[in-house]
Each structure stands twice: as C-alpha cells, then as structure tokens.
Amino acid sequence: MIKKQKALIVGGSNGIGLALAMRLVKEKSVLIVDKVEPDYSQVPSDIKHLVSFRKFDLLFDDYSLFDEFNDIDTLIITAGFGKLSLFEDMQEDTIVDMISVNTTSVLRIIKHFYGSIHSRKPFYTAVMVSIAGFMSSPFFSVYGASKAALKIFIESVNVELKKSGTDNRILNV
C-alpha cells in the first residue's frame, strides 16, 4: 500500500495559503496550521475531508506542535503580516511581533523540519518571502527588513543543502 502524501501549510486559512491548499488537495491531504480557522465555504464539499486544521499562533513560545507532523512531505509557509507605516510611527510591540511572525517563526519551523529537508528523500519546502525583501520600500521598512532576512537565510541554507549532497532546497516564493 502506498502512503498518501501530506502537505503542511502554515498560514493556509486564507489568501494565497488557502489557494495553495485547494490546489494541493488534488494531489495529497493538507493540514493547515494557522491562528484562525479556514473559511470552509471556500473548500468544495467533495474534498473537505482531505483538509484538516490545527490552531496555532506564531507568537507562541512553544513550537513543539510541529514535532507532531512527521508524516509530511511538503512544507509551505505563507504566514506573515505587514503594516503600512513610517518607521518613526511604528509601535515597538508591532516591530517585535512582525519580526517574530515574519522571520523568527519561519526559522523555527524550518528547524523543526530540517532533518527532512536535509535528507536524501524528496521533501518540498516553500516560503512566501515577498518582493519587499528584495528592495527598499518606504512605509514598509520593518516588513521589508523581516522579508530580506528570510531571503538571505534561504539563500544561505540552500548553499548548505547543496554542499551536503541533498537535492532538496527551500523555494523562496
């Protein structure tokens, strides 16, 4: 019996994450981890049983939830947020939360799945970075910085993966 593949989408309750879930569910079961439940009215009834949900806020300290998902072969991280604001007007707690959700949480999740990413067995990983991580953007200084950090992180880890001999890479979307 061939085991059905499974995708984990962090931030898959709406937007691009949910659209990816609806596309992937044609090929494999999908687990969505997000702080809000998906809008199930967007999920066709004939495939609803292939989509499951676990509530999790990326601002939590304990990421052990991700240790439960050792049966996935695809990891997609789309979670993140931005705030249109001049840096001088941004509250410090917003800065901390944005860096935590957009950058630190991604590194922590990648770390939880690094054994699978680093293995010789195919493991598909994609992170929604943003064009803001590639260029300066007034009113998006903190968001851009959080995404630029991801860009450099992914490039660096991909070099490490290549040098280790695995064909797996992290796709910067």
Where are these regions (language model features)?
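N-terminal Rossmann NAD(P)H-binding glycine-rich loop of SDR-like oxidoreductase domains
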Residues: 13, 21
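Substrate-binding pocket helix/loop in short-chain dehydrogenase/reductase
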Residues: 86-87, 94-97
